[in-house]
């Protein structure tokens, strides 16, 4: 039996982070977590990390699609926060967003990690961006590193 598992260190990889400006007070924590993991665990240099700010989560997919066609990056990380309001707008965003991102990843054979929070309230978002429940930006970074390395050995 053969077992394959991607490692976390990927010091020569180039990563693009696409991050939403909306809810930036939360998203900046996600970004800090992602960058820390890429540098400290993945051993990436700052010059191998590119950050693209977009207005909101809905604008992330077009940049992901554009960057995936350039063959410049080994992996992409998406960061943002969608907090449930009084309408069902958040449900539409979450379903469509994930489907679009997953389709791009499969079509372009590029690891794309989703570090977008979908929460019921602001407290849940804060907890997932670096307090009680860890940092989902860091988790997204580790996931993309592992997938980059797994694809290299398959």
Swiss-Prot record:
GO terms for cellular component: cytosol; riboflavin synthase complex. It is an enzyme of class 2 (transferase). The active site is at 89 (proton donor). Pathway: Cofactor biosynthesis; riboflavin biosynthesis; riboflavin from 2-hydroxy-3-oxobutyl phosphate and 5-amino-6-(D-ribitylamino)uracil: step 1/2. Its EC number is 2.5.1.78. CDD domains: Lumazine_synthase-I. Catalyzes the formation of 6,7-dimethyl-8-ribityllumazine by condensation of 5-amino-6-(D-ribitylamino)uracil with 3,4-dihydroxy-2-butanone 4-phosphate. This is the penultimate step in the biosynthesis of riboflavin. HAMAP family: Lumazine_synth. This is 6,7-dimethyl-8-ribityllumazine synthase. It comes from Wigglesworthia glossinidia brevipalpis. The lineage of its organism: Bacteria, Pseudomonadati, Pseudomonadota, Gammaproteobacteria, Enterobacterales.
């Amino acid at each position: 039996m053969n077992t394959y598992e991607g490692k976390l260190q990927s010091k020569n990889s180039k990563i693009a982070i696409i991050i939403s400006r909306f809810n930036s007070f939360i998203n900046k924590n996600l970004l800090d977590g992602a960058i820390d993991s890429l540098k400290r665990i993945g051993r990436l240099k700052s010059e191998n990390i590119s950050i693209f700010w977009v207005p909101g989560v809905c604008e992330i997919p077009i940049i992901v699609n554009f960057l995936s066609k350039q063959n410049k990056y080994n992996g992409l990380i998406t960061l943002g926060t969608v907090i449930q309001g009084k309408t069902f707008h958040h449900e539409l965003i979450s379903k469509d967003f994930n489907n679009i991102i997953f389709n791009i990843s499969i079509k372009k054979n590029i690891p794309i990690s989703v570090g977008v929070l979908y929460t019921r309230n602001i407290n849940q978002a804060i907890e997932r961006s670096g307090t009680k429940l860890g940092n989902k930006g860091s988790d997204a970074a580790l996931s993309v590193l592992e997938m980059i390395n797994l694809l290299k050995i398959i």
